[in-house]
């Protein structure tokens, strides 16, 4: 459009110029004759006009070519910018996905450790003499009793998963072990109904530990191993050990309300051998707990266990049913805690039936080969800021029939006392004295006692 206007303007300019020249010539000559343009002049003017039109056309072509080049350049720049932006967008998407995983995943750990001195004595007659054995080693040393590493991932508001490993080191045995203590998928459908599939906390022991508060100093009474004192092949569990499992493989249903007049419960159907043993058997075991809190600071709970503890296998020997009943009454507020736990068990060690005659625990019916009654009482008081004093006393009476069906007895007494200090929110230290004394079995007198003093600690993150 601009080139056409320019052509018209040039032509008009040339016409006006020619007309002015002719007018001037006419005026100077003062001749009234008519102005005429000869053919040569007209041809010259047409040639000039054609030349100007050619120049305008050439200029227009150059301008259009330049405009096309600018468009191509802009497109190329845009393509480069898009190409440069795409990796950034992909990286951003990957970072968003990673952030989502990180935000919904929690990694933590708990370590129980101690630096103590042990004095262990045992014997069958006379005064016990110093001797290493039954889980005790004389001398001074540092132990990492437990180290739990936990990964917890939340898929959504309902589903989550947990993996907890259990590492322990025993300096007396110079060995380490690593197990999967918890590995479960959880569906939380309501505060009163959560289900877990896999290895998870059992109903009783972890529940008592929360109210006790000093697990890093000592296991609760049903989780404590009573080493030594029993001999013979009737104890399939390898002697008098713990009377329960803190975790096992199976299906677990649990729920709770909060505040005053609240309830809590858990029912677990499990393999029966604990989290360290995935052994399959012909039947499953069950453990349950029900608790009631008239006020938030107090709980009254009962529990029970029944099963073969994984010993009922195909073409195996006949079995008995192991049972355990539990009761807990506890109180805990910001300054004071106290509790009493009681349990009664039958056939906990003697699952497999053995031939034998004579009197003894349930020998006439051939049903009960061992039974135990135990109780534990504890208290603690936070008397100043991070400082607290605590004490605990355990008593166990254990009876069993030996291979000739003669009843034998074991009596175990344990107590500890100490003072604890919360160094940090996640670091606790305690100066503790422990005493354990075992007597029996009476048919072949056997005794041992252990005194231990030192520091116990718990680090969590």
Language model features with spans:
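Short linear Ser/Thr-Pro motifs
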Residues: 17-20, 257
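Outer-membrane beta-barrel pore domains
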Residues: 5, 36, 71, 119-122, ...
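Solvent-exposed loop/turn segments connecting transmembrane beta-strands
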Residues: 168-177, 244-246, 275-283, 317-319, ...
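A general secondary-structure boundary signal
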Residues: 32, 45, 52, 59-67, ...
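N-terminal secretory signal peptides that target proteins for export/translocation
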Residues: 1-2
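Outer membrane beta-barrel
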Residues: 95-124, 129-272, 280-287, 291-302, ...
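N-terminal periplasmic/intermembrane-space "pro-region" immediately following the signal or transit peptide
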Residues: 6-7, 12-13, 21-126, 461
């Amino acid at each position: 459009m601009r080139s056409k206007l320019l052509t018209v303007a040039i032509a008009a300019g040339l016409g006006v110029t020619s007309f002015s020249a002719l007018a001037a010539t006419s005026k100077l000559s003062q001749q009234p004759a008519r102005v005429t343009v000869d053919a040569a002049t007209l041809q010259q003017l047409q040639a000039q006009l054609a030349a100007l039109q050619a120049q305008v056309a050439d200029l227009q072509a150059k301008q259009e070519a330049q405009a096309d080049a600018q468009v191509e350049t802009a497109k190329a720049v845009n393509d480069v910018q898009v190409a440069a932006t795409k990796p950034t967008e992909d990286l951003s998407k990957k970072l968003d996905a990673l952030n989502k995983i990180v935000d919904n995943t929690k990694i933590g750990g708990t370590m129980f450790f101690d630096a103590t001195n042990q004095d262990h004595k045992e014997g069958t007659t006379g005064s016990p003499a110093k001797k290493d054995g039954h889980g005790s080693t004389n001398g001074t040393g540092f132990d990492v009793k437990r180290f739990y590493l936990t990964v917890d991932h939340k898929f959504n508001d309902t589903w989550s998963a947990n993996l907890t490993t259990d590492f322990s080191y025993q300096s007396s045995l110079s060995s380490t072990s690593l197990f999967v203590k918890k590995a479960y998928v959880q569906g939380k459908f309501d505060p009163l109904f959560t289900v877990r599939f896999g290895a998870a906390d059992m109903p009783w022991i972890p529940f008592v530990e929360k109210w006790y508060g000093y697990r890093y100093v000592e296991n609760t009474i049903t989780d404590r191993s009573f080493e030594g004192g029993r001999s013979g092949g009737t104890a399939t569990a390898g002697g008098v050990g713990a009377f329960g499992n803190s975790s096992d493989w199976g299906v677990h249903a649990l729920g709770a309300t909060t505040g005053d007049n609240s309830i809590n419960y858990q029912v677990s159907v499990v393999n029966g051998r604990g989290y360290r043993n995935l052994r399959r058997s012909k039947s499953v075991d069950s453990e349950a707990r029900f608790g009631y809190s008239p006020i938030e600071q107090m709980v009254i709970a009962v529990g029970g266990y029944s099963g073969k503890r994984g010993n009922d296998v195909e073409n195996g020997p006949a079995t008995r049913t192991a049972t355990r009943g539990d009761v807990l009454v506890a109180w805990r507020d910001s300054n004071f805690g106290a509790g009493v736990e009681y349990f009664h068990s039958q056939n906990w060690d003697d699952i497999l039936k053995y031939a034998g005659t004579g009197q003894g625990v349930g020998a006439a019916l051939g049903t009960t080969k061992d039974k135990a009654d135990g109780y534990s009482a504890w208290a603690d008081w936070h008397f100043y800021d991070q400082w607290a004093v605590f004490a605990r006393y355990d008593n166990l009476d254990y009876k069993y029939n030996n291979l000739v069906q003669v009843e034998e007895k074991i009596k175990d007494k344990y107590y500890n006392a100490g003072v604890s200090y919360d160094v940090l929110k996640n670091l606790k230290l305690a100066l503790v004295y422990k005493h354990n004394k075992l007597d029996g079995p009476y048919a072949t007198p056997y005794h041992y006692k252990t005194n231990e003093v030192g520091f116990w600690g718990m680090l969590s993150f």
